């Protein structure tokens, strides 16, 4: 029988996935595909010129000390929708912080829709998430990030923990949007404040950067009326923020908004499985 030595670092989930695409014969095709560790990328068949990429964490969730790195490079003229196989679960951390870093590059006349399903935080989870995006002057980009502070239907609640979310979006090298969210220690008490989430436990941020700002804004605003949220467009970007009592209520608003920002296209099929 082998006994682990005292002080041995517990096994951690680590992974790195990279996808690069090119335009070939009028369709988006693979240029590079790399997978390492717990990171996997699957490419379902599509019936148009676009590509759909489903990223998977085979570890089934993350806890303190785990790390996942994703990168996407959309070449000129390509179209890529990136989503996740399921909601990412962030479990209680006994030590350390789980990290997820995503880097996206969108070339000339290309579009990337970053559409991961919700991240579910459990009590005493610790997560630092980063999103870095570089856009060509003529590129389009849509990002959606939704978070659940526990699953209300399961009786779960996040009382304490750490969640940091950092976005940096650049166009032609110039910063056009930055996010810096931090929920720490007394998460439940912080979320209860009216200036934060007003007691809601499900929330989402959506960002669109591209030439259809005004058209999309006119479609989105009626969809968020009557909910806890809002939509604004300025400086070449459209930002939507939503909050709801639970994940189901959030999806009822979120999915129509995503579709509106995709010119009527539905969310990826894996969202409905």
From Swiss-Prot:
Q: Subunit info?
A: UreD, UreF and UreG form a complex that acts as a GTP-hydrolysis-dependent molecular chaperone, activating the urease apoprotein by helping to assemble the nickel containing metallocenter of UreC. The UreE protein probably delivers the nickel.
What GO annotations for molecular function exist for this entry?
nickel cation binding
Subcellular location as annotated: Cytoplasm
Would you tell me the protein name for this molecule?
Answer: Urease accessory protein UreD
Q: Which residues form a coiled coil?
A: none
Task: Keyword check for Cytoplasm, yes or no.
Answer: yes
Main function = Required for maturation of urease via the functional incorporation of the urease nickel metallocenter.
One cellular component (GO) term of this entry: cytoplasm
Q: Indicate whether Cytoplasm appears among the record's keywords.
A: yes
Species: Rhizobium johnstonii (strain DSM 114642 / LMG 32736 / 3841)
Query: What family classification does the UniProt entry report for this protein?
Result: Belongs to the UreD family.
Query: Which InterPro entries does the UniProt entry name for this protein?
Result: UreD (IPR002669)
